[in-house]
Amino acid sequence: LYNPDSIAAAIRRLMDGSLFTADELIQHHDLYHSLLHHGSFSAPTADECLERINARLSAGAEFLAAADRIIITFGTSYVYRWKGTGLVVGNCHKMPDSYFRRERLSVDEIADTWLPLMDCIHRRRPTLKWIFTVSPVRHLRDGAHENNLSKSVLLLAIEKIISHYPTIANYFPAYELMMDELRDYRFYAEDMCHPSPAAVRYIGDRFESTYMDAKTIAWLRRAEALHRDLQHRPFRPDSEAHRLFVVKTKLKQDQLRAELPT
């Protein structure tokens, strides 16, 4: 999700835990879709689509209930509204443009959506912290000027939101790091819109040094190494060497899980 309205809708749903129903789906090209979800949730039947969506919703709600921080990244202030209902969609599923109305949210519209949401969550979870960022990915469909206007709206909206909750919300300058410290085009991928791997590492390192202590960073490095091990695809899965690799990987996984705070 990239726009503030859809992100807020997702968090609201995760907090109240209400399951999706068939009347929230649409059928297009022999598939059932949710306008709030990625295409990977779409399915040939409504039941299968809902099963995928609600399983992920339940897992996400459980994860959010245990979280002590929420990191929010706004990508664009442009939204697409489904003409039938006025709903701001998270995914158009490659349907015709004529089904949607495109518009740019204002600073006040974004703040008016997020402030009541955060107030509601803060009353239930007073210790929960928020980290807001603006994505450095450039949305150039309408040109660089429109992208800059869109990002400006996001920056001003976040400033307004944080000013209401200075003790529980702050801003991480991912966008500014890309625009100022990494402004050379060698820090962009070939599409000239996304940050290069080097830029991603640079911004990630700055995030770690801002929000994590040395012990947490060490855990993160171990988790990254473990993730690489788990993604390994053996040439000979029936070999003794691979069996030992699996045993060692499971041991590292158990050790890390035992050390991490619950």
Predicted segments with their positions:
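Extracellular glycan-modifying ectodomains
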Residues: 1-262
